[in-house]
Design a protein with these regions (language model features):
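Conserved "HGTGT" condensation-loop signature of ketosynthase/thiolase-family condensing enzymes
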Residues: 1-108
């Protein structure tokens, strides 16, 4: 999210409502900050690379999620091994740059 009190809560609740509780979630923004117009491309690459490798990055500096946020599996502290067929990249940025992309694993 945009790291605002209302934005992060609304975004996490919407994610839970659409995908259900307990879905693993992390944020690359904790690594790069606000990249504005580049956020979609960077986030898409990051998501695909994590799915390809089967290792998912934690959100840096996240120790206790806001209790008002959706009931999701917030990746904290350490990289996690996860195998998945799909990954979703959300971008909710300043100025209404909002995208959600879903990628499916392709086997050679």
């Amino acid at each position: 999210g945009t790291a605002t009190d209302r934005g992060d809560v609304a975004e996490s609740q919407a994610t839970q409502q659409v995908l259900g509780s307990g879905k693993p979630i992390s944020s690359m923004k904790s690594y790069l900050g606000h990249t504005l117009g580049a956020c979609g491309a960077i986030e898409a690459w990051w998501a695909i690379e994590m799915m390809r490798r089967g290792t998912f990055a934690p959100t840096l500096n996240l120790t206790t999620p806001d209790p008002a946020c959706g009931e999701l599996d917030y990746l904290m502290d350490a990289w996690r091994m996860l195998e998945t067929e799909y990954i979703m990249s959300n971008n909710f940025a300043f100025g209404g740059i909002n995208t959600s992309l879903i990628f499916k694993r392709i086997y050679d």
